[in-house]
Amino acid sequence: ADLAGIETVRANIAKVNPGAKVVDAASTLRLQDPSVVDGKRVLAVEDGPTLTHGGMKIGAGVVAAQKYGATEFVDPRPYLVGKLQETFEIYPNIGTILPAMGYGEEQLRDLEATINATDCDAVVVGTPIDLARVVKIEKPHTRVFYDLQEIGEPNLDGILDEFVSNSDLG
């Protein structure tokens, strides 16, 4: 978020819960294997609700793949299978990102078929789960991880230590 967005969140927190402790942090992204996307034409698979209901134009996979040298994002629309075709009809502004719309049997089957049919060099997985555990990705692929980088104090360790001390848990 930009500074104005952060200040809006701070003001809302103060309004709703004036005594709340706020931890400043950055969410940094890293890839399991950056070499998979470097210089490659990449298919980005992202968290579906983030793109559809959330209206985001990019997700963690796109950001990380750009950071690590992807040269192009391949459009999955010509390769869509099953319910994913309906998803793009309902949400035509998704663009060139493939949303993982759920983890039911049919959804996973459609997602797997679409990924494997897409003409790309590599796949970047920006979903909250390890997608390769539930679908067979037949192309080189790598997963995005999020790391929390706390900035200053208060920090989570200090807040939890205080809570434990004050709660007779320690």
Residue ranges and their predicted role:
Residues 1-22, 134:
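Conserved C-terminal guanine-recognition region of P-loop GTPase G domains, centered on the G4
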Residues 17-170:
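P-loop NTP-binding site
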